[in-house]
Amino acid sequence: MDSERRQERIVERMRDRGCRITPQRLAIVHSLFTLGPEHPSIEPLYAAVKRDYPTTSQATVYKTVALLKEMGEVFEVRGADDAAHLEVIRQDTHAHAVCRKCGCIVDVDLDHPDELMSEVATIAEFASLDRMIQFSGVCRDCARASSRDTE
């Protein structure tokens, strides 16, 4: 499903829940998709919406994000800074590689995610698991910078 259709589906689901669909809420949904690869925290999301809708309150952004999380459309990825970074839930299972130095979050597509999730659930004796896999380490840029510093 393409981004535009997905956004329309999310807005329709919000409407079905009785939410008023304001220009600000539409901008929040749209910004989650346009800022998505960056895994934004609330602050950049708020700034993006506020540029077009200066009267938007931070509370509106928080409440809309909370609603989208409750609806299962958005979830939080914890960065190295321990801040909540947002991601629109994708249909595929992928991992996140989080750099402990700069905090960047990289999406990593997996070949056999269902097998991996099933194996982890079996070994850990979990009835179910969220479909999020996260690794932490040091990204290539930070590793290079570190090696230059030690030379």
Model region roles, listed by residue range:
Residues 41-53:
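DNA-recognition alpha helix
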Residues 61-71:
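Basic amphipathic alpha-helical segments that dock to polyanions
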Residues 4-18:
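Short, Lys/Arg-enriched N-terminal segment that forms or immediately precedes the first helix
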Residues 26-31:
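Pre-recognition alpha-helix immediately N-terminal to the DNA-recognition helix
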Residues 70-151:
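Non-DNA-binding regulatory cores of transcription-related proteins
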Residues 21-23, 35-41:
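Short capping segments at the starts of secondary-structure elements
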